[in-house]
């Protein structure tokens, strides 16, 4: 029997409708361009956009090394790809403007809750199992994602939230799963993890010793989950078949 359960975020509890990610990206570029102009720092919009694109690719490379950078580190990364000296030219007001421009667009163009996400978390909570979240953060950092989860009514079910930008570790790092296990003082074999990504979620959690349930039909790429479900409302049955819950 398991003593705790953990969830991935994107593709598991929330997802983006078509075009929302692009709208979010364009808003980020526009807000950054406008914030820089307010500070008397005039850059071509195309240069700002190009800087974000290259910085996003660099962030992916950082994640590939199973590490991450802080929320402020994201802003620095993006700004340096616009102008290497730009971060050194900002005062406190400038940092506030740019942090907001870079980090918060998801509050305006929000993701959508996965079907049955709230009901699934509520059902697990009734069992008395602690629920954790382990998520890699992209351009949107953990503190913004918590605000979104709170607005969706999901945060109240989560007893621990581990975001990559806050621990500076990224899935599939074994260490980020161990960090989450420590939150509940449970052994890997006493916990299950639910996620959609074959490498980040399935391989990562299995390598850390957790029971693994994959949601969705993304190819396993050699990483085999203990169980697979199409929708969250199938999770209880999957856990019972694995004899992890009564």
Predicted regions and their residues:
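N-terminal helical cap/lid subdomain that shapes the substrate entry/recognition surface
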Residues: 2-122, 126-127
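Asp-based, Mg2+/Mn2+-dependent phosphohydrolase catalytic module
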Residues: 1-5, 9, 22, 38-46, ...
